[in-house]
């Protein structure tokens, strides 16, 4: 593999293809009411005083927060979630994309298939053009990974998928609520400020999940996908500053530390508490691995090299 080509691809990560065509507009429009209902229900759970998830001062400052659901994110980015003022923007494409990844992950896991194909798919979206796929179109996760349309009929797949999805949506919503609560500016003045804002938002979201005894399984999958898709420190400090939700090793290590320190709290309501504590610690170890990967320039180059060698047919290999 040409080293110059690899370095060029790493440097130009922010210029990924337009993924706004992942799903037909009619599909997104049909799914919008479902996501609107689910995310607003989740916001209501956070806001309900009897649940004691948001503290009184937090509820007061977050009063009037509204959720909006455009069909597409900026530039067709399927990982786009953001907030400004008292409004949190949750594009339907982004929500459906991640929900489909949760279904794919659960089905592959339940059938003891190769999990790495999810990372392969995400890296192909980031580093390859639509001509790398059949019909010269970027395919949605369930199509690209050949997940059967009956996957949800398996109760264990359904339950695991929903557990990933619901906990991820709770983390994403909590993260965006934090940006509003702390009044983080949309425009990041410095790289250091951007890092601080993201770490504060992560900590706030995880604290809400700790208070509600929700194990952040979906957050692990979200950041696993992000490690392979979103701009990070390996692509340079300027890109990290400009990214809406930049990744760096310190941010992921902070998440791991918070999970390790509060493992028993996240699992306190589980009837199998010992098993669930072990799960939280497993998730924390996963974040430590993601941090090591982000700190390894050779790993970042290897991601690009691997993506450039992949064929769409490889995504169906079990």
Locations of regions flagged by a protein language model:
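Long alpha-helical scaffolds
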Residues: 3, 79, 128-130, 219-220
């Amino acid at each position: 593999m040409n080293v110059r080509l690899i370095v060029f691809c790493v440097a130009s990560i922010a210029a990924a293809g337009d993924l706004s065509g992942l799903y037909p507009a009619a599909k997104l429009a049909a799914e919008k009411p479902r996501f609107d209902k689910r995310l607003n229900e989740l916001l209501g759970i956070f806001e309900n005083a009897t649940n004691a998830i948001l503290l009184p001062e937090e509820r007061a400052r977050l009063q009037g927060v509204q959720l909006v659901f455009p069909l597409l994110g900026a530039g067709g980015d399927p990982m786009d979630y953001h907030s400004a003022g008292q409004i949190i923007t949750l594009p339907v494409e982004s929500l459906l994309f991640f929900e489909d990844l949760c279904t794919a992950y659960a089905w592959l896991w339940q059938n003891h298939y190769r999990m790495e194909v999810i990372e392969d798919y995400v890296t192909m979206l980031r580093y390859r053009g639509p001509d790398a796929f059949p019909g010269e179109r970027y395919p949605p996760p369930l199509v690209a990974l050949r997940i059967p349309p009956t996957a949800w009929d398996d109760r264990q797949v359904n339950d695991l998928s929903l557990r990933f999805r619901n906990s991820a949506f709770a983390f994403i919503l909590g993260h965006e609520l934090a940006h509003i609560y702390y009044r983080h500016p949309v425009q990041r003045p410095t790289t250091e400020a951007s890092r601080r804002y993201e770490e504060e938002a992560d900590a706030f979201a995880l604290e809400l999940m700790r208070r509600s005894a929700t194990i952040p399984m979906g957050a692990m999958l979200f950041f696993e996908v992000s490690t392979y898709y979103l701009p990070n420190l390996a692509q340079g400090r300027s890109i990290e500053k400009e990214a809406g939700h930049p990744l760096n090793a310190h941010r992921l290590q902070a998440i791991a530390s918070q999970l390790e320190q509060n493992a028993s709290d996240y699992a306190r309501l589980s009837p199998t508490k010992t098993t669930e504590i072990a799960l939280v610690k497993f998730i924390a170890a996963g974040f430590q691995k993601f941090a090591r990967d982000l700190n390894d320039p050779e790993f970042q180059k290897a991601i690009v090299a691997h993506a450039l060698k992949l064929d769409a047919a490889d995504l169906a290999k079990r």
